Amino acid sequence: MTITPPTNPDEPVALYAEFTALPGRGDEVATMIAGLTVDVRREPGNVTFDPHRRVSNPLEFFVYEVYRDADAFQANITAPYGAVFNAALGDLIEGEGSVLTWLTPVPA
């Protein structure tokens, strides 16, 4: 799978992924994302991988991610454990998969 982030290839890639677990599957999704977090944070190109649940609806998940550059992001999305996670996640969430929102820093 190739996803091209809308940034200069040498700049950091920042995004958040969001998805909603099916009713009764939120804790299972939380356990899966906790395991994925350990793997992703070990990647040399990962800067930040912070999963969250919405307080008002714990079935809704948001993951804030930052990678060193586009190559580090591609390494993340092609990692074998990511493919296993995404395949399993598809049966536990609403819709077709995670919705990705690309981010760019606001200059200070």
Q: For the regions a protein language model found, what residue spans apply to each?
A:
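An amphipathic, aromatic/His-enriched active-site/gating alpha helix that lines ligand/cofactor pockets
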Residues: D39-V47, V66-L100
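Hydrophobic pocket/interface hotspot
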Residues: A17, V29, F49, V63, ...
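Active-site-flanking beta-strand signature of metal-NTP-handling nucleotidyl enzymes
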Residues: V13-F19
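Short, surface-exposed ligand-recognition loops at beta-strand->loop->(often short) alpha-helix junctions
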Residues: T20-D27
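Localized chelating/binding microdomains
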Residues: A34, V63, E96
